[in-house]
Amino acid sequence: MFTRYKIIRSFRELKQLVEACLNTGYASVDFETNAEGIYKDTFKPTILSVSFQVGSGCSIPLQHFDESVKEIPWLKWLQYFGRRVVENPNIVKVAQNFKFDNQIFVKYGIYVRGTVID
């Protein structure tokens, strides 16, 4: 199977990703972190990986060494995605160990609505 994977490097691409999730009604999400405890001051979500269909996916660099490619701070990117996708009850969220990912969303003021398949 051919797999397409993209690193989101501009706000325009982030908007396109959100549109794709809205169009399919699905978003598979998974955070990568710096492995610090979530409640430590040193905790950092580094990447949010998202897929909206089989065979494709995107990585959104957050507090990652590649952050310099973005014109908008990482938290604004996360909140933009979160408000439109994670908080959208019409989009089915798919995850593995969502209780961890959800803790990160909540830490940054994003509250899941709708169906979650874990």
Show where each model-derived region lies.
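Conserved RNase H-like, two-metal-ion catalytic cores of nucleic-acid enzymes
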Residues: 1-118
